[in-house]
Amino acid sequence: MQAIIKEFQLGQHTVTLETGAIARQADGAVLASIGDTSVLVTVVGKREAQPGQDFFPLTVNYQERMYAAGRIPGGFLKREGRPNDGETLIARLIDRPIRPLFPSGFVNEVQVIATVVSVNPEIQPDMVALIGTSAALAISGIPFSGPIGATRVGYIDGEYVLNPTLKELEESKLDLVVAGTDNAVLMVESEADVLAEDIMLGAVVYGHEQAQAIITAIKEFKAEAGKPTWDWTAPAKNVSLEEKVASIAADKVGEAYRITDKVARKEALGVAKDEVVAVLTSELAEGESLDKQEIGKIFGSLEKKIVRGRIAAGEKRIDGREPDMIRALDVMTGVLPRTHGSAIFTRGETQALVTATLGTERDSQLIDDLTGTHKNHFMLNYNFPPFCVGETGFVGSPKRREIGHGNLAKRGIAAVMPTLTEFPYSIRVVSEITESNGSSSMASVCGTSLALMNAGVPIKASVAGIAMGLVKEDDKFVVLSDILGDEDHLGDMDFKVAGTAGGITALQMDIKIEGITQEIMQIALKQAKAARLHILEVMDKAISAPSEELSQFAPRIYTMKIPQKKIAEVIGKGGATIRQLTEETGTTIEIGDDGTIKIAATDGESAANAISRIEQLTAELEVGTIYEGKVVRIVDFGAFVNILPGKDGLVHISQISTERVNNVTDHLSEGQEVKVKVLEVDRQGRVRLSIKEAMESAAPAADAPTDA
């Protein structure tokens, strides 16, 4: 069993690719490693396509094994279950740059499985998985126009940093992933701390340049370990049928694409397609049948040719707009009375209903992954129900696309969010897409910014998002602002940019063709900035600053600090004291290890009551001070008196009266209120009290000290 190993340097790290020792029955299997982070990537393809298959069934699975970090999974089963959101996002990150590189017409099933088997917490496994996938596909023999290289780029102290560690990313103003071939960028995914367009473009170019070392190494690895390429040829085009379909439907498709309303346009295209089927069916000889899937594919190609040709020739777009025009905008805030914050953002035929909900730290999301357990205080969920595109469909748990779009919107907003210290709330945003015709994720960014401001969340600035498209025919190209769903489907690029008036906060790019130059990206960024500023201007007319008051239905959070040694007194035995406090005051109380207490209440009176009770619980008794107390228990040698919540002291029989006391019950009864003087608090916290000295003392009774 002879393993083939390839090592190469990538920035500060050494990358190792190994094949031939593990998973030898897969078409391609590579153990990719950077430092102690290792990912096993396998690729298997079916030699024969399913009969009637009309799409490319590529599946990418990314899975993190807890043993990779020396941990045992939680839960009853103690094993990994369905992919979490993080795993789903990385699976999409791998899928996006490799999918365009399979040849047109290739519809054989291909499955990529990336399994994290060892992890160094400082080296993220996503880049290792991407590099491993590229290498595994390259050596598999499956038709693939790779390899690709992928890098992560940070921006620290004005310098680009290649593949920064997790610690370096904490200081970085940028987290950008770029993937591409030796001569083209295919995919960009990023989050930024309000950076200028030229810095973002520079990061893309830098990352692509650095990825060349990966591509070169994988080519050398393939030369040594690669399997013969499959003997596959693309199915021959049915030219005569294409010409026949065009002769029947070209004019009607052209007319349909001059209809600006999406629903009406869809109906017109349906009529044209039905006519094609009817005409061709009438011309069939006896015993012949019509391949409706093939007809549908040819009809789709005709649509694409007509729309792209018009745009490239300088004609107006499908809905009558110029290339840089934005659809009509409509913005409303505070639309739902009981939510903490809400907004409806409408751009043409795309609409998002967005809500913001405030909660306590206890409401934050607990994430258990390879790096350990940590809390997520800002959650953004994106829902794309079938009715938003006028269809019926399955409604249930979120699909990969919904998870990805929600994450993109969240990354676009993250840079302007307050810290937990500045605003001690957990925040959940939900974007319900109620209409969709292109760029619903960017509508979610705009709606989120509006809903957060409506909720009174002190975000640093308004954020807007825009989706750009591209039509490139030979040397001609047109960059489109605010693309429709059809333009996304028929175009060559999906380029999404979110940001404030001051710069970019998120950038996502997916390119379907090679040849996207730096010039094209520069024009797209410039056009996107103009569009973003226009949208921000409209949004600011609706709401330009966070509401000064929170919703009356939102919890108010008050913060106080107690000495760490007093934490146990507030919690009580088995949590009894804090449970009693929350029940009696109607508040939610959270205590940090450093003694910070957060009290959440829907009204100020409840919070003030809870604060007062906690101050009493944590107050230090002062020797010589007189307190008002209540007798709670009588014993033969005296009585126990409660002087502060949770604090009892003993009045010895000799300290009850100036007269001789033979029987305690002759002078005191349970529930009786008395004034007592603190004589002593010993090392164990036991308190000696005196009624006699309180009566003799001339000092006035003191209220409970509020030393907290």
From Swiss-Prot:
Pfam families noted in UniProt: KH_1 (PF00013), PNPase (PF03726), RNase_PH (PF01138), RNase_PH_C (PF03725), S1 (PF00575)
Q: Give the enzyme class.
A: transferase
PROSITE patterns this protein is in? KH_TYPE_1, S1
Q: Where in the cell is it found?
A: Cytoplasm
Residues annotated to bind Mg(2+): D488, D494
Return the protein name: Polyribonucleotide nucleotidyltransferase
Kindly give the SUPFAM superfamilies that the UniProt entry links to this protein.
Eukaryotic type KH-domain (KH-domain type I), Nucleic acid-binding proteins, Polynucleotide phosphorylase/guanosine pentaphosphate synthase (PNPase/GPSI), domain 3, Ribonuclease PH domain 2-like, Ribosomal protein S5 domain 2-like
The KH domain covers which part of the protein? Answer: 555-614
What is known about what this protein does? Answer: Involved in mRNA degradation. Catalyzes the phosphorolysis of single-stranded polyribonucleotides processively in the 3'- to 5'-direction.
As cofactor, the record names: Mg(2+)
Name of encoding gene: pnp
Q: Say which species the protein is native to.
A: Pseudoalteromonas translucida (strain TAC 125)
The Gene Ontology biological process annotation of the record reads:
mRNA catabolic process; RNA processing
Question: Can you tell me which family this protein belongs to?
Answer: Belongs to the polyribonucleotide nucleotidyltransferase family.
Question: In which domain of life is the source organism classified?
Answer: Bacteria
Task: From the UniProt record, list the reaction(s) this protein catalyses.
Answer: RNA(n+1) + phosphate = RNA(n) + a ribonucleoside 5'-diphosphate
